[in-house]
Every structure is written in C-alpha cells, then in structure tokens.
C-alpha cells in the first residue's frame, strides 16, 4: 500500500480534506488532516476565496499552480467554474511572467520531462520516468525558442507545455493522467539567461543542424514506441525548426504544431464565421496578411488549402493572397523570401507602381483586400484611412488585428467598428468586451487558439487516429465557424471562451468523424459521439 504521506503528495490521487472518515482509516491518514470532511464544492469555494485575496495576476497564477501541484481534481473543478477569469492567468498573458522568472520561482517540476540535447541516450528513460507507468495519449513538447511574443527562454519554457495541457483538460476534458509536458533543453541564445547564475538550464548557445534534428528524431521514435496511441503537439519552436519538424512527421504520425496550424485554423474558423454572417463565399475574397512570419504564413496556408478544398486550383487560389511585411508588399523576386512566403509572393509585373508599395497603406490601395489579418505586432498599423478605404469597396470588410498582447495589436476593435460604420466583421487576438454602437451590442470574437486545439486533439485521440490530416483540420474549422448566430446584429465571428467546453466537444466530434471517414482510426468505432464522450474526464472524486 502507498504510504500516507505519498498519497497526500500525489496530485493525481490526493483529495485533501475531502477524504472520507472511512478512507482516512483505510489509507492511514488519520490525524494527518483536519477533522472536517469537505465536499469538493466546499473545497472549490474555499480555494476561490483564497484566490480572490491575491493581488497581482502573477501572485494568482503561483497560487493556482500550488493547487495544481497538490490536487488535480480540485484545480480543474475550480478552473472549469471560472474559465473566462482564469484563462489569462493560467495561460497567456500571465504565463509569460512565470516563464521569464521560472528559475527564480522554481519550486517543483510539475511532472514534466526535461530532455538534455547532450544526452540523447537518456531520452527513453526520461520519458519513462516522467510517465511513471501512466498511459500517455497527449504529449506537448517545446524547445522554447519562440515563446509567445517573448522569444527564447530556454528550459524555462517548460511552463508553456504545462500550461497548454491545462487548457486541453479544462476545454476538452482530456484526463490529466494521460498527458505529459516535455521540454527539450537545446541551450539558449538569450544572453540574460546565459549570464544568470540562477538559470536552471544548459548554459550554451542553441544547438543547430544535424545534432539537433537527430535528437528530435530519436525523441519522436522513443515517444511513439513508449506511447503507441500518441498525439504529439509541438509548441513554440523557432521559425525554421517549427516548419521543418512538422513537415518531417505530419505524414507519419498524429502530430500538430499550434504556432503554424493552430492560429491558421482558428482564423479560418473566424473567417468562415464572418462569411456566414455576410453571406459571401471564401473563393471570392482577396486576402492580405500583414506579417509574414510563422503565424501569418500558417494562416495563409490554411486559408489557401480551404480555397482549394472549395474548388479552386492550387495556382488560382494563390492569386487570392498578398503578403505585407516590414518592407511592404512581398514580391517574387525578393531574395530573402522564406520557403513559406515564396509561393504566395506577388508578381512584380502585375503592379505598375510596385516600387512604391513599401507600406501597408499603399498595398491596401493597390490590392483592395476584402480580408485583412494582422500578425505583425506593429501597434496601430490598421489606420482609420485603411479601414475606411476597405469599407468603400467591400460591403462587410473582414478585419482581424490579432497580434497580442493588447499593446501590440494592429488596431482596437472599437476603432475598427467606428471607422467602418459598424460594417467590419472583427476578430482580435485578445479578449474584448462587448462594444455599444448605435444602440446595439457588438460582440467581438477572439481568435484564440484555445478555441480549436483542445477539441482538435481530443477528437484525434478519441478516434485513435494514425494521422492529423488537412481534412480533419478543415472539419475542425468548419465546426467552429458554423457556431455563429447569423440572425443577431453584432454577432461575434467566433464563439466565446465561456462556452469552451461545449464547442470543444463539437470540434472533437467533427474531427473524430472525419478521421473515421478517412479510415485512420486504429480500432473500429461504431458510434463516434459515444467514443468522444467516453474519453471525457470530469474533475470529481
């Protein structure tokens, strides 16, 4: 029998003051807890009151992590009852503070696996040790080179994997005993960390090239061998590594990169929701991306695939896309184009004034986009002039300033709504309160990846899918984009975070059905909805 102290220290089985008198007797816990036996809801209410006494968001997050480290059921029950309030604290943006201060704040490893680039021989044993006999179905891994908007944070980025898994569980209901957070410590190029005596990771510059990719390959092989029904989620890798890794494994295993695919899927869902409101077709739209990095190009790729799915040829679809970066409109003769940008760069010969298209305003005037999406982190770049220009040639311009945090957004939703006389269909990267405009409350959809990746992954896991295909991704986007209320003035293009659990199930069912339809399920499934519901974990004792 497990010794009593170990039971109280194991967050998977600890109930704290909710252990009954009979359980306390049986498990040897008599005298180790206060006399009162609490119901789970009593614990939740008490813990929430303690949470409310904390002042800063960082203090609140550290408190919640103490609960997580102690009692998973209590943590997730509390989180599920306060999703809207807790999401920005458990995850983005507050998680950035704990990542930047991880070494100074370090208390315990939170069940994560720490892989050292210099010790590939330890990959298998590390994963085994961290899993501790659990049946791992979902693994979130990061090398933390491109964390959120804050860059390279080395081993401290493990927090992003831990936080991501928390969202998976509260949104979709993945059992926390079947997930594992992994960080690959490949060094860091962050000088602040390299000079910090308290930094807990490897103190050398990032390893690149064959040694790095060989390590990744060994990791994938060991993970697949140890956990045969695995869904592998890559998080916050650097730009070049992210796409190389995804391209290497997406046709071999069920795998997903949130930075490349997640933002693309949720923006596609938002665009589909906007088009449902306006009654227009995607294949009639002209798309402009302001920002052509990992996120921007991930969105372009997703919408391009959807246009092809809707009947355009590959080349026809490409003509609907235009990229604007810091140097202006990107042209096909630019020697610095990335492999992702090259297929979508404009032909210089198509523009008489090509040399003058060196900023967003000029590009908008030349191209006349009907959809404008910002991932540039250049604040206030969607100007009144641009919004009014778009509103002049398209009835319902789709404008998504999704850079975050708020101070980096390309425009404020309220301004875009006002400048377009209420015509713009808006998505943002941060939560926005309802906006009163001409007697109506306009709801603003948040293009938050958390709307999509939990249901997407859960559906693939429920179907025991061998791969995550473009068709499954498209099914996810359509299921989310189909939730909008087209009868209501000011309806949001995406559903609210408050309904996260409900529509995560909708997404999961759509994805699982598509996997079964494509014959990708490892085991026969007669009833997809039942398979999804049977997998769902509820936080209860």
Curated annotation (Swiss-Prot):
UniProt cofactor(s): Mn(2+); NAD(+)
Origin organism lineage: Bacteria, Bacillati, Bacillota, Bacilli, Lactobacillales
Temperature optimum or stability note: Optimum temperature is between 37 and 45 degrees Celsius.
NCBIfam families per record: malolactic, PRK13529.1
Chain's gene name: mleA
Top class in the EC scheme: lyase
Binding residues annotated for Mn(2+), in chain numbering: 235-236, 259
EC number(s) recorded for this UniProt protein: 4.1.1.101
GO CC annotation, single: cytosol
Residues at the active site: 91, 164
Reaction catalyzed: (S)-malate + H(+) = (S)-lactate + CO2
Transmembrane region(s): none
Job of this protein: Involved in the malolactic fermentation (MLF) of wine, which results in a natural decrease in acidity and favorable changes in wine flavors. Catalyzes the decarboxylation of L-malate to L-lactate. It can also use pyruvate as substrate.
Stated name of the protein: Malolactic enzyme
């Amino acid at each position: 029998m497990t010794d009593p102290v170990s039971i109280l220290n194991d967050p998977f089985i600890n109930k704290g003051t909710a252990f009954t008198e009979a359980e306390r007797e049986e498990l040897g816990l008599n005298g180790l807890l206060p006399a009162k036996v609490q119901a789970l809801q009593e614990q939740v209410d008490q813990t929430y009151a303690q949470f409310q006494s904390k002042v800063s968001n960082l203090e609140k997050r550290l408190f919640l992590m103490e609960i997580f480290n102690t009692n998973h059921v209590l943590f997730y029950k509390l989180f599920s009852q306060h999703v809207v309030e807790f999401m920005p604290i458990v995850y983005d943006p507050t998680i950035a503070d704990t990542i930047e201060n991880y070494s100074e704040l370090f208390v315990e490893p939170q069940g994560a696996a720490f892989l050292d680039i210099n010790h590939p021989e330890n990959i298998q044993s590390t994963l085994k040790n961290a899993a501790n006999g659990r049946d791992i179905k979902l693994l979130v891994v990061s090398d933390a080179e491109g964390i959120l908007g804050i860059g390279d944070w080395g081993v401290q980025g493990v927090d992003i994997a831990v936080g991501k898994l928390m969202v998976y569980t509260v949104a979709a209901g993945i059992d926390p005993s079947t997930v594992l957070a992994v960080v690959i410590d490949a060094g860091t190029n962050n000088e602040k960390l390299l000079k910090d005596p308290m930094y807990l990771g490897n103190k050398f510059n990032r390893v690149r090239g064959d040694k790095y990719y060989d390590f990744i390959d060994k990791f994938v092989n060991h993970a697949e061998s140890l956990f045969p029904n695995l869904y592998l989620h890559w998080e916050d890798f650097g730009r070049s590594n992210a796409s190389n890794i995804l391209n290497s494994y997406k046709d071999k295993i069920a795998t997903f990169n949130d930075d490349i695919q997640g933002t693309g899927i949720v923006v596609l869902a938002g665009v589909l929701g906007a088009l449902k409101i306006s009654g227009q077709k995607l294949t009639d739209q002209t798309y402009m991306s302001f920002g052509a990095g990992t996120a921007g190009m991930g969105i372009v790729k997703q919408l391009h695939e959807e246009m092809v799915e809707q009947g355009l040829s590959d080349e026809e679809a490409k003509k609907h896309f235009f990229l604007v970066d810091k140097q202006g409109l990107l042209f096909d003769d630019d020697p610095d184009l990335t492999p992702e940008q090259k297929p979508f760069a404009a032909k210089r010969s198509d523009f008489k004034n090509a040399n003058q298209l060196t900023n967003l305003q000029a590009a908008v005037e030349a191209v006349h986009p009907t959809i404008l999406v910002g991932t540039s982190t250049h604040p206030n770049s969607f100007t009144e002039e641009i919004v009014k220009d778009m509103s002049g040639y398209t009835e319902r311009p789709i404008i998504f300033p999704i850079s975050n945090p708020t101070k980096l957004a390309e425009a404020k939703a309220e301004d875009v709504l006002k400048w377009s006389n209420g015509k713009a269909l808006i998505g943002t990267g941060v939560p926005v309160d309802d906006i009163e405009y001409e007697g109506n409350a306009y709801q603003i959809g948040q293009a938050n990846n958390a709307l999509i990746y939990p249901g997407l992954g859960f559906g693939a896991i429920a179907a025991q899918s061998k791969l995550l295909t473009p068709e499954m991704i498209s099914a996810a986007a359509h299921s989310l984009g189909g939730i909008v209320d087209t009868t209501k003035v000011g309806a949001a293009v995406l559903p609210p975070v408050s309904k996260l659990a409900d529509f995560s199930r909708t997404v999961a069912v759509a994805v699982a059905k598509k996997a079964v339809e494509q014959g990708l399920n490892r085991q026969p499934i007669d009833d997809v909805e039942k398979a999804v519901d049977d997998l769902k974990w509820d936080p209860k004792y």
